[in-house]
Design a protein with these regions (language model features):
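A domain-level signal for the structural core that forms small-molecule/cofactor-binding pockets
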Residues: 1-152
């Protein structure tokens, strides 16, 4: 359900760091919202053509994270989520916390289709999951079962 896009300079992160960041963001989202890990998509983009600037100076040691998430969660939950992602990514990437930018964009669940179905509002995941075809439920359980923290 959430999609987090991390924009990083090319060759800034190792493959292991990218894997750790994806795991950390997935974990933090689930921890904050209760959403199962198979809902969390993390994209790490390295672009040779994109140049980012701050104050007209190249910003070569910054990481930008944009999370498109379902609307309906309190500001307190969103604030904790952003700060925990910032701290985790800072530690993994070995950059200052001030170099991590996190933006959450709240989308209405009815404006999102994933796995072929319009998404439920927060707190209605179980009913949504139970309404899915058995084959899709099995597929999603398989994704979540790869993590020790799987729950629905």
């Amino acid at each position: 359900m959430p999609t987090y896009v991390c924009a990083v300079p090319p060759k800034f992160l190792s493959d292991d760091q990218k894997n750790q960041i994806a795991a950390a963001i997935s974990h933090r989202h689930g921890e904050a919202t209760g959403a199962p890990s198979f809902f969390v998509q993390v994209v790490i983009e390295e672009s040779w053509s994109a140049r980012r600037y701050l104050g007209a100076e190249p910003a070569d040691h910054h990481i930008w994270i944009r999370g498109d998430i379902r609307a309906g969660r309190p500001q307190e939950v969103r604030g904790r989520l952003m700060l925990s992602i910032m701290k985790d990514v800072s530690a993994i990437a070995k950059v200052r916390e001030e170099s991590i930018w996190v933006y959450l964009c709240n989308l209405e669940p009815t404006d999102m289709v994933e796995y072929g179905h319009v998404l439920p509002p927060p707190g209605k995941e179980q009913e949504w999951f139970e309404s899915l075809p058995a084959s899709l439920q099995a597929y999603l359980k398989g994704l979540g079962a790869k993590k020790e923290t799987f729950r629905l």
